[in-house]
Amino acid sequence: IVGSCLDNMQPQGFDKIKSISKNIYDICLEQKTQNMAITKIGGMLRTNKIKRIIFASVDKSPHCIQLHYIQDELRKMMNLSNIEIENYVVVNNELIKISSEVISLSKNLKELTNLKNKVGDKI
């Protein structure tokens, strides 16, 4: 599941995603709500035919980052232990794998501030 702008903004990175999976669905969370996406993806998962989901987006987009938050909401709705979930951002047409811990941390500004204060100007 990719941000719909990925193909235009990072075409070689998008091609790398296509080499990983032949089933690619795109969504623009600027046009559709995250809740709509969660409902649709949740319905797809309930078929029990999906064993792996990849979320991929451009980096630094306030809309695309929401794509990566979908997994947390899905976990609240259902057991995803039998589904492999991967997250990538594409920077300079390269896939950068992002852990679910980093995604969760990105929603916690207080904790990010604490980390920044610990490391100082190193980041």
Give residue ranges: language-model regions.
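Iron-sulfur-associated redox domains of electron-transfer enzymes in respiratory
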Residues: 1-123
